Design a protein with these regions (language model features):
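Catalytic domains of carbohydrate-active enzymes, especially glycoside hydrolases
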Residues: 34-102
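An active-site-proximal structural segment forming one wall of the substrate-binding cleft
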Residues: 127-141, 153-176
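Hydrophobic faces of well-ordered beta-strands that scaffold small-molecule active sites
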Residues: 45-51, 90-94, 146-150, 175-179, ...
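Substrate-binding cleft of secreted/luminal carbohydrate-active enzymes
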Residues: 244-318
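Aromatic-lined substrate-binding rim segments of carbohydrate-active enzymes
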Residues: 100-151, 201, 205-216
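Active-site cleft segment of glycoside hydrolase catalytic domains centered on the general acid/base Glu
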Residues: 159-163, 167-171, 178-214
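Substrate-binding cleft/loops of secretory-pathway carbohydrate-active enzymes
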Residues: 155, 159-166, 224-252
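Aromatic-lined carbohydrate-recognition surfaces of secreted/lumenal glycan-active proteins
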Residues: 144-158, 206, 210-229, 267-277
């Protein structure tokens, strides 16, 4: 079963069942993606691979939606060519709100006209760099999925979910929502790394998300396992680590493995490629592939892999 991606450089053929890959010639920085083969209905991907995208991570590419689509697909295709079986789905963690210094959250889109609930701790600003409606439409058209992420501060997470779903829930690319817990009641936490997410709160968020679509997923992200729900588990819930600042790949893997061990019975995911780790990953041949292969080999419950936007223009995903 093949996923065929056509570009100006030629055809790129990625096969997930048999690890075969036809490499294109490199050199065309503005590659164009014409078609993405869809995963057959009823079959769930083995892995989700792509990019983190925020308005502040790589601002010079804020309006270049096709650029993000192409690289998410290329990264997923590259991983598909390195695994033994299954499908690899291109996915973008799409961040629509940012933590505010006053402890609240800034939404990068207009409040939906039909929304009448709480807006405590929220500011709505449409001029923040990314046209989220346009970006999500580009994902829809090209077979790239998205999870909407919040940096909620002290705003109500249930309200965050409802507002975003009213604004963007019509997009077929969306498969769920996520929260960066480092920015969850950050100002109220002693070390300003966010308050721990309580089991009962995670359960409420999960139930809210599933009320919109029973197939939707929820991720909770942090670098410190102590900030995660202690006992709450759900098949549609997964935990995402954005840990960074390591001296080498082995140290990163020790931390990532510890994260997985702490999240017993749950699927896990990882963000990597941070500038703070560039000293060692930049010395690798094909850093996205090398790091991903190590994660998948060492951590069986790792299903979600993302290169961060901060350095997404400094590596090749082919």
């Amino acid at each position: 079963m093949s996923c065929i991606i056509k570009s100006l450089d030629g055809d790129i053929v990625y096969t997930a069942v048999k690890a075969q890959q036809k490499e294109p010639e490199k050199g065309n920085a503005m590659r164009k993606l014409k078609k993405q083969t869809k995963i057959p209905a009823g079959i769930k991907p083995s892995y989700y691979v792509g990019l983190r995208r925020s308005s502040y991570g790589l601002s010079k590419r804020n309006s270049a939606d096709e650029w993000w689509v192409i690289r998410a697909q290329e990264f997923a295709g590259m991983i598909a060519g390195s695994v033994d079986s299954g499908y690899v789905q291109p996915l973008i963690v799409h961040i629509v709100s940012g933590y505010s210094g006053d402890g609240g959250s800034v939404f990068e889109f207009a409040k939906p006209k039909g929304y009448t609930g709480s807006t405590r701790g929220m500011v709505f600003s449409v001029d923040r760099g990314i046209d989220h409606e346009k970006a999500l439409a580009a994902y829809d058209e090209n077979g790239v999925q998205a999870i909407i992420q919040f940096e909620p501060g002290n705003s109500d997470m249930l309200a965050n979910i409802e507002i975003a779903h009213q604004a963007f829930g019509h997009h077929s690319c969306i498969i769920g929502y996520g929260v960066d817990a480092e920015w969850y009641f950050t100002k109220e936490s002693k070390d300003e790394t966010g308050l721990p997410v309580k089991d009962e709160d995670a359960k409420k968020w999960m139930e809210s998300i599933l009320s919109h679509n029973p197939e939707y997923t929820l991720f909770i992200k942090h670098w410190n396992p102590s900030r995660m729900p202690r006992t709450y588990r759900h098949p549609n819930l997964w935990y995402l680590s954005d840990s960074q600042i390591f001296p080498d790949l082995d140290s990163l893997m020790d931390d990532f493995s510890y994260w997985s061990n702490c999240m017993k019975e749950q699927v896990v995911g990882y963000q990597f490629g941070y500038p703070n780790d560039k000293k060692w990953w930049s010395a690798m041949h094909n850093p996205p592939l090398a790091i991903s292969k190590r994660i998948l080999a060492d951590i069986p419950r790792a299903k979600f892999l993302f290169w961060v936007d901060f350095t997404a223009d400094e590596v090749d995903f082919r």
